[in-house]
Regions:
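Conserved helicase motor core of SF1/SF2 NTP-dependent helicases
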Residues: 267, 275, 279-283, 288-292, ...
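Extended, charged low-complexity regulatory segments
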Residues: 1-207, 211, 215-216, 777-782
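Domain-scale macromolecular recognition modules
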Residues: 93, 99-101, 107-111, 530-533, ...
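Short, charged/polar micro-motifs that form catalytic or ligand-binding hotspots
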Residues: 87, 91, 196, 200, ...
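Alpha-helical nucleic-acid-binding subdomain
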Residues: 250-548, 555-563
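A structural signal for short, well-ordered beta-strand segments and their strand-loop junctions
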Residues: 100-102, 227, 262, 575, ...
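P-loop NTPase Walker
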Residues: 1-41, 191-313, 719-720, 727, ...
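Conserved motor-region signature of P-loop NTPase helicases/translocases
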Residues: 115, 161-201, 208-275, 642-724
Length: 782
């Protein structure tokens, strides 16, 4: 061991000793604070005097409750902070830091050794930093700078100086395995080790291997919208999650994880990335799929189709007579032009076109749709649209109140009163005594007739409950009828926003109307329908969310992005995607995020391109980039491996037998995650049924919420964003993948592989494979 390595190991030992001392302190303080919280909860009501005899006593009770709640909240906050710090220290025990820069600040004379780890550490005085958090301003030089003149930016301005050296450490269980001086951001030795490992059931976040271009994403803070367009395996998702950790660190006094929202592609992906932020010492941000949001808003009224059911239709239903009509609808309803059309239609409703529902009780009208319509377009026409609806709602409430009052005198009510229980009589009686301020000592009493009136009031109010709810929720507006009307009336023609309609417009309208009548809402209609509903009834925005992260952004339509922008008006946005993996029909013919630049305007938008692919071995990347136009811009990381293999087979039986053998071979090589990737969910289910005899094989569906190690059968579109040690592409034939519209789907399947890629073909291989023939080994089973 060299003298320098010996000195560095001594420092590691000292730092770990300090970490252990702090762990001991925090374990004690965490236990103490936990007990404080338990004690406060246990004695909460003992320390509060509840007295409601008069207003002053009641006010004193409220103040006492608030004080106790504040004490509890402070104790819980202290316990949370102590627990968080304890968790950070425990993670640092084995690997306290991973890098070092030697920096001589201009005008300061001495060179400072800056050690960098996943969290900061100071000495016992709290004044000297032993380790700097990777997110600290000074740490940016480790990722961005090479030895020589360098600077980093602090809240007080730039700090300049000379970066003399940059060191990298591989530390395991407190022992330095290796250390080396490097002039690169991250030495290939560390990156090779990391990338050569097996895929895991959760995404790893390894801040020691952040590359310079990824660091630009992480620390970007200059525009409202950041677009990251990255090749498959370029690390865009992990960089974006590290970006969230960085923002939580930088703005820790005014930003919390609850104010950050990640739109994930599916539930399984949510599970896959769930460990990244906790690994970095931060709480998980909120996660939701866009479909979950649509269901939350619309599933009470409709059976809402999900995006994967739509995609399954696109992939498997080309024989449907309505296929071309629906495809045209999918494409047009995803456009900004359709978004503008709905806004224009909403403007037209100011003058005419609103459709209302009757409000009735027991079949008798309280207000007919015609009366409501006439009232809306006659009264308060100078007010804003939403205020006109509020006035209309107030008028309806008055009508319902009068109808309810009149109903109390009806014979059915009097008959029902004769059948009420003693308990109901007692409740009405007690209510009236309290209402009139009678105490137990009062000599006066409630008149029996008043009790009967109170019972009648309660009984009718229960029956009218649905009507009141209907008015509160503006259920008297017939949104489905207005949406259908948009396809057939003057609203579509004269107020359409100027965009040219598809030739199939009338047929699209007929299909949409028919399905709405059946209570079904297609995926391509869900966001437009919700937008129309919001524009009419009043937009429900969320101003508490300050940052929105959209992964697999190529799967979102321009329409959906416009909707998300309106939904979170106070938020910045980071979107990540790769149009070479755009598998949904609405993205046909789109190859970049140009349309997103208009979301907030070019001056508020930055674009970062990630062209280096780290996930797969060089042979796999060389093959996959040959599958797509412009693929030569993708740069493979120089990690050796086996050439992808295409095996031609005669029939399905031969294919299945060969897959069984290949799975066995991959397992023997030590691969823990193996995916058999199919074109569709229907094909996946069939393949799983055939291969269910393979030990530990699992079927992944759109309902799967967790990815586990082993062998999985999975449709391509659910595998996006996830990586596997070895991938088997099921039947990569020209019959399966022969249309240009399937090129991106095929590319997505092949780019899931980290170490091994095996393709099978029954008959003629896909034309996409033939175009990349120079980068694949071929064999056949006769």
């Amino acid at each position: 061991m060299s003298q320098e390595l010996k000195q560095e190991q001594q420092r590691v030992n000292q730092v770990i000793g300090i970490i252990q001392d702090q762990i001991d302190q925090y374990e004690e303080s965490t236990a103490r604070r936990r007990q404080e919280v338990v004690d406060i909860r246990k004695h909460f009501w003992e320390d509060v005097t509840v007295n409601t005899d008069n207003f002053d006593d009641f006010l004193e009770t409220i103040i006492s409750l608030r004080q106790q709640s504040e004490v509890l909240s402070l104790s819980q906050g202290s316990h949370r902070q102590a627990s968080k710090r304890l968790s950070q220290l425990q993670r640092m025990q084995d690997v306290p830091y991973f890098g070092r820069i030697d920096f001589a600040e201009e005008g300061m004379g001495d060179t400072e050794r800056v050690y960098i780890g996943v969290s900061s550490l100071t000495d016992a005085t709290g004044e000297k930093f032993l380790i700097y958090d990777w997110r600290a301003p000074v740490s940016s030089m480790y990722y961005d700078c090479t030895p020589g003149p360098a600077e980093y930016v602090t809240p007080g301005g730039p700090i300049q100086g000379i970066l003399e050296q940059k060191w990298q450490y591989i530390i395991r269980s407190g022992v330095i395995q290796s250390m080396f001086d490097t002039r690169l951001t991250i030495g290939d030795e560390i990156l090779q080790q990391v990338l050569g490992q097996s895929a895991d059931t959760h995404m790893r976040s390894i801040v020691a291997t952040i590359q310079q271009e990824q660091n630009r994403i992480i620390r970007h803070d200059s525009t409202r919208l950041l677009i990251v367009q990255g090749a498959a395996g370029s690390g865009k998702t992990s960089a974006a999650l590290q970006r969230i950790a960085y923002l939580l660190y930088k703005y820790r006094n005014r930003l919390t994880a609850d104010q950050m929202l990640l739109f994930s592609p599916n539930a399984m992906f949510k599970s896959y990335v769930s460990s990244v932020l906790p690994e970095l010492g931060e709480e998980n941000m909120q996660q939701v799929t866009f479909q979950e949001y649509l269901n939350h808003r619309l599933s009470d009224s409709f059976d809402v189709e999900d995006p994967y059911t739509q995609l399954e239709y696109v992939l498997t239903a080309s024989d449907d007579p309505n296929y071309n009509v629906r495809m045209a609808g999918i494409r047009f309803k995803a456009t900004k032009a359709f978004f503008d059309r709905i806004q224009s239609c909403r403007q037209a409703l100011e003058k005419s076109g609103m459709v209302f529902r009757d409000i009735s009780f027991k079949g008798k009208p309280i207000a007919s749709a015609e009366q409501i319509n006439e009232r809306f377009y006659r009264e308060h026409t100078t007010l804003r649209f939403v205020n006109r609806l509020e006035k209309l709602s107030e008028w309806l409430k008055e009508l319902v109140k009068a109808a309810e009052k009149a109903e109390r005198r009806k014979p059915w009510v009097q008959d029902a009163i004769e059948l009420v229980s003693n308990d109901e009589y007692q409740q009405a009686y007690v209510h009236l005594r309290k209402k009139h301020g009678m105490t137990e000592e009062s000599v006066e009493d409630v008149d029996l007739e008043d009790v009967r009136k109170e019972l009648a009031r309660r009984m009718v109010r229960r029956k009218f409950k649905r009507i009141w709810q209907n008015i509160r929720e503006m259920g008297f507006i017939d949104i489905p009828a207005i949406y259908k009307q948009m396809f057939v009336s003057h609203l579509a023609a004269s107020e359409g926003g100027g965009a040219e309609l598809p030739p199939e417009w009338n047929e699209i309208g007929e299909m949409t109307s028919h399905l709405l009548d059946e209570g079904k809402l297609l995926y391509e209609d869900a966001t437009p329908y919700l937008l129309l509903k919001e524009l009419i009834e009043g937009f429900q925005t969320n101003v508490s969310i300050r940052h929105v992260l959209v992964d697999e952004a190529q799967d979102y339509s321009p329409f959906q992005f416009e909707f998300i922008k309106r939904l979170f008006p106070a938020a910045k946005m980071t979107v990540l995607g790769d149009f070479n993996q755009a598998v949904f029909a609405h993205a046909d013919g789109t190859d970049d995020f140009g349309m997103l630049a208009e979301l907030y305007g070019p001056e508020h938008t930055d674009v970062i391109l990630l062209n280096q692919s780290y996930r797969s071995t060089r042979p796999i990347v060389e093959f996959t980039r040959a599958l797509i136009p412009g693929g030569n811009e993708i740069i493979p990381f120089d990690r050796n491996g086996n050439t992808p293999v295409l095996t031609s087979v005669a029939d399905a039986d031969q294919l299945h037998q060969s897959i069984r053998q290949k799975v066995k071979s991959f397992r023997e090589q030590g691969h823990r995650t193996i995916a058999i990737i199919c074109k569709s969910a229907a094909q996946s289910a069939s393949v799983f049924e055939t291969l269910h005899d393979i030990d530990d094989i699992k079927l992944i569906t759109s309902g799967s919420i967790e990815y586990k190690q082993g062998i999985v059968v999975i449709p391509v579109y659910l595998a996006k964003g996830i990586e596997f040690d070895a991938v088997i592409v099921y039947n990569a034939s020209d019959e399966e993948y022969g249309e240009e519209g399937l090129r991106r789907l095929f590319y997505t399947a092949c780019t899931r592989a980290m170490h091994e890629l095996q393709l099978y073909s029954i008959g003629e291989p896909s034309r996409f494979v033939q175009g990349a023939a120079a980068w694949i080994a071929k064999d056949s089973i006769s």
